[in-house]
């Protein structure tokens, strides 16, 4: 953290970063619920993202000296715990990032302020069609802070070493054949892919290719037992054939990237992950491409995920314009993008992305390329996770553990997953 940023942080909050987290988790804000007129801004991430955003907030307040910003941040899990506490106390930050599984949960809890016509909010970079796509059930109550899509990432260095190339038109069948062949024949004993049926966005793409949706418009689980079973079965065939890392090699169902990154040719991921994860193995070149497709994939299966942020419905009227200006800064500022980069996804503002591209890192340019490629595809509507579904990934991991331990068949695990998720939604 720069000296300027540290001074600004202490000026904004009056306490250190650990105190911010501790006070927030206790249900009381370091900014006194904005009682001093500060705009409270909450986000998640590691130390590098925290520093980048603090530096960006320096730039924002330099341009808007009349606006004070009180930052609140933590890692992803701590952020969600803090938000739960703040929701219960109705002490929510003025502007806040929204975890993917909580978009409708937060809406149903009444956290979002309607942004239609909000003074200070600049949406001039977006078309009317884009703005319509941002709405939830017709209401403009959240905005995308970044966007990304599922991809297949691969180690281009490993491919070159073997004199190999991925199939030009990737299908689930020909990718499986390729991974089996690579695992059996590469000179260094690497595996074709890390065991990854826990990857949520590739899973959703797989379902959509089968004509299903992960979530339906009316807030139900759209995935069928057959759809879930087909997904797990694709992975299990590879695992049993030795084409994936073993559970011991990746230390369980959900490995960290440093555990497996030099052991595999490919991994499924989100399009933005390459920015940070490639840095873990600087001696290798990584690239990425669209996920495989069924030969008879349902039309419009592609999707772009909006990572959203919002303004709290309880922001006092006299602070709405300042909060909206901070949101506009997040949407439109080249300076902010130059500081935070694309590790959290590409900006939804295409003009901003065009401006940034000449200075993007090589890995960020790969994010830009796939973002533009997928933006050109046909995309049918995608629906957010309903209230009560926030634990669905853990439920999937639980069933995958049962399968890999030999304690459940794939059909039984798929049925148990569907039953458990439906039960949690019904009980919400």
Segments and roles (model prediction):
Residues 1-20:
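N-terminal secretory signal peptides and thylakoid transit peptides that target proteins
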Residues 59-126, 161-163, 256-266, 280, ...:
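Extracytoplasmic "Venus flytrap"/periplasmic binding protein-like
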Residues 62-63, 160-162, 233, 240-244, ...:
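Extracytoplasmic/periplasmic substrate-recognition and gating elements
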Residues 93-94, 122-158, 191, 298-301, ...:
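A structural signal for short loop-to-beta-strand junctions that line the ligand-binding cleft
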Residues 100-149, 173, 287-289, 375:
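Hinge/lid segment of periplasmic solute-binding proteins
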Residues 129-134, 289, 342-391, 395-398:
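Long, aromatic- and glycine/proline-rich binding clefts that accommodate carbohydrate-like moieties
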Residues 141-145, 150, 173-222, 227:
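Extracytoplasmic/periplasmic solute-binding protein
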Residues 179-180, 219-248:
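Glycine-centered hinge/linker elements that transmit conformational signals in sensory
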């Amino acid at each position: 953290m720069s000296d300027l940023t540290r001074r600004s942080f202490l000026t904004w909050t009056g306490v250190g970063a650990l105190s911010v987290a501790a006070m927030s988790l206790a249900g009381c804000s370091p900014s006194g619920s904005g009682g001093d007129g500060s705009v409270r801004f909450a986000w998640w991430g590691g130390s590098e993202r925290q520093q980048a955003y603090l530096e960006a907030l320096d730039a924002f307040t330099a341009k808007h000296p009349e606006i004070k910003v009180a930052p609140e941040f933590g890692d992803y899990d701590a952020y969600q715990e803090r938000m739960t506490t703040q929701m219960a106390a109705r002490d929510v930050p003025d502007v806040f990032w929204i975890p993917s599984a909580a978009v409708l949960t937060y809406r149903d809890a009444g956290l979002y302020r309607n942004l239609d016509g909000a003074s200070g909010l600049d949406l001039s970079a977006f078309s009317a069609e884009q703005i319509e796509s941002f709405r939830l059930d017709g209401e403009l109550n959240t905005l995308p802070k970044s966007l990304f899509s599922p991809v297949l990432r691969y180690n281009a260095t490993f491919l070159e070493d073997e004199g190999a190339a991925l199939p030009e038109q990737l299908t689930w069948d020909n990718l499986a054949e390729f991974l089996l062949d690579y695992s059996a024949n590469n000179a260094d004993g690497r595996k074709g892919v890390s065991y990854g049926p826990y990857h949520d966005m590739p899973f959703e793409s797989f379902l959509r290719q089968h004509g299903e949706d992960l979530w339906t418009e009316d807030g139900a689980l759209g995935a069928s037992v057959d759809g879930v079973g087909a997904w797990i079965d694709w992975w299990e065939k590879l695992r049993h054939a030795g084409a994936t890392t073993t559970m011991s090699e990746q230390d369980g169902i959900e490995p960290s990237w440093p555990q497996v990154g030099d052991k595999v040719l490919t991994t499924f991921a989100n399009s933005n992950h390459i920015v940070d994860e490639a840095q873990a193995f600087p001696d290798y070149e990584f690239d990425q491409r669209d996920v495989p497709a069924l030969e008879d994939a349902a039309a419009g299966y592609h999707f772009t995920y909006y990572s959203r942020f919002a303004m709290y419905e309880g922001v006092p009227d006299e602070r709405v314009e300042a909060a909206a200006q901070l949101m506009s800064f997040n949407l439109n500022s080249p300076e902010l993008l130059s500081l935070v980069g694309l590790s959290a996804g590409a900006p939804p503002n295409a003009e901003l992305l065009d401006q940034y591209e000449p200075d993007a890192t090589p890995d960020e340019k790969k994010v830009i390329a796939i973002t533009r490629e997928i933006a050109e595809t046909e995309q049918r509507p995608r629906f957010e996770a309903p209230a009560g579904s926030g634990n669905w990934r853990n439920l999937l991991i639980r069933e995958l553990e049962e399968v890999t331990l030999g304690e459940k068949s794939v059909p039984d695990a798929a049925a148990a997953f569907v039953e458990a998720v439906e039960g949690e939604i019904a009980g919400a």
